Amino acid sequence: MMNFLRRRLSDSSFIANLPNGYMTDLQRPEPQQPPPPPPPGPGAASASAAPPTASPGPERRPPPASAPAPQPAPTPSVGSSFFSSLSQAVKQTAASAGLVDAPAPAPAAARKAKVLLVVDEPHADWAKCFRGKKVLGDYDIKVEQAEFSELNLVAHADGTYAVDMQVLRNGTKVVRSFRPDFVLIRQHAFGMAENEDFRHLIIGMQYAGLPSINSLESIYNFCDKPWVFAQLVAIYKTLGGEKFPLIEQTYYPNHKEMLTLPTFPVVVKIGHAHSGMGKVKVENHYDFQDIASVVALTQTYATAEPFIDSKYDIRVQKIGNNYKAYMRTSISGNWKTNTGSAMLEQIAMSDRYKLWVDTCSEMFGGLDICAVKAVHGKDGKDYIFEVMDCSMPLIGEHQVEDRQLITELVISKMNQLLSRTPALSPQRPLTTQQPQSGTLKDPDSSKTPPQRPPPQGGPGQPQGMQPPGKVLPPRRLPPGPSLPPSSSSSSSSSSSAPQRPGGPTTHGDAPSSSSSLAEAQPPLAAPPQKPQPHPQLNKSQSLTNAFSFSESSFFRSSANEDEAKAETIRSLRKSFASLFSD
């Protein structure tokens, strides 16, 4: 019999022919059957039959009743267990056939951490600096630190992106993907010394719309020192040589124009390099021609500026609103103060230095972290020759303080930018079944379409709410004197109005309505004259309400199809009644 039912119910045409909202109450919890009252003894019967009057004396007081013996738990009948297994078979068969919307997955937990990507060398532990910090109120900061050489990424035009990072696990390099919310760049994105060209990663971050310090646009512009020097030339023309003493410089796009210079010695800088690399001091015209031949092999640009016999170098840095000035003096006598031995000390911050760094911090839309480098010559004059961005190295005795300043600056920028740019979550379909109709389901449960019939066994619906051609199966009401039979007249709808608070019946309030009806029944003091419905009848009734289909599903059809469906249901009910009746 079960195999027959499984084959019958696995047929997609069987469930597809069910009318809208027909199988609903199988998902409701089964009402607990009250335990049968214990058989009253003759003394208890006479006591219950006597009116509750005051006892005139202690001799007429009834003896205390002994505690009733615990009654055994009611054993489920064979029909009840059979219908339970049949209900499970119906659910499994319909779910495997794809006729029921898959339950929506539980929503993912809200992200309680923002991912910060720090591009820096491994000697700086930025995770320690951000430990315990929070952004946007209650979001932790998860730090992912790597060098440019360990990173890769993919970005899409819709704003989705993913960053791949190589990490060492048990001595083996593996790739791990994550999605950063903010980027702090503390490493040069381009350098010709070791073919370190990571501008494609900067482009990818800009493509993904990642906020960063400094801005990705400024970082890309700093990948060519002559381009940055052109901005210094514009500042020099605006402020003048007294306020902004910029060194003289000549730019050569290639070696062809490197013929001669009027004065020597000069410093030739080839290409874009850092830490003094690619810089050559040229004493005469012959050495300059030799350098021009080297530039021809590099196939890049070069600049030449007069050599300044310096007493010390000056570095003025700005991190947010914090300013520091340093002086570096060479001890070994090398013309490059960063080569050999040198003495570094912090000096007072003057208004002149502050003007330099404040003016340079406005280039390329604003620099949150920058530094101005200058040379103080033996002639007593200052010469500005370079500006560094957020990739500047930290120097001096206050490196820990500078890292703390950068940490606070990053947190401030994350609170400012991430609040306006929430992270995009990948959109995933919640249901596997697509509705055939073009209408969308109304989230408001009070706006129930008129063609939806009430759940079987629930409170009645006015006649005007029933669709034409819909044949409703007979309703079985629980026994009770307070529940009048349902009819199609207007008096029936008005009499059932007090039992239907809150408008039309929906799936959400069907269990509460049935429970309120059950509470309205008075308890039976005497043995009932009408037998209670058999559990099998309740089960057969609930079998037709196994699933809850939405208004936008595929069960809408014309009146003729509704009549055919109703005829199928009537024949099905007759089959169940003949199969499972006693």
From Swiss-Prot:
GO terms for biological process: calcium-ion regulated exocytosis; chemical synaptic transmission; neurotransmitter secretion; synapse organization; synaptic vesicle clustering. Residues 1-29 are annotated as: A. The keyword Membrane does not apply. Residues 43-52, 462-474, 485-523 have a biased composition (Low complexity). Residues 33-112 are annotated as: B. Residues 420-439 have a biased composition (Polar residues). It is linked to Schizophrenia: A complex, multifactorial psychotic disorder or group of disorders characterized by disturbances in the form and content of thought (e.g. delusions, hallucinations), in mood (e.g. inappropriate affect), in sense of self and relationship to the external world (e.g. loss of ego boundaries, withdrawal), and in behavior (e.g bizarre or apparently purposeless behavior). Although it affects emotions, it is distinguished from mood disorders in which such disturbances are primary. This is Synapsin-2. It comes from Homo sapiens. The lineage of its organism: Eukaryota, Metazoa, Chordata, Craniata, Vertebrata. The gene is SYN2.
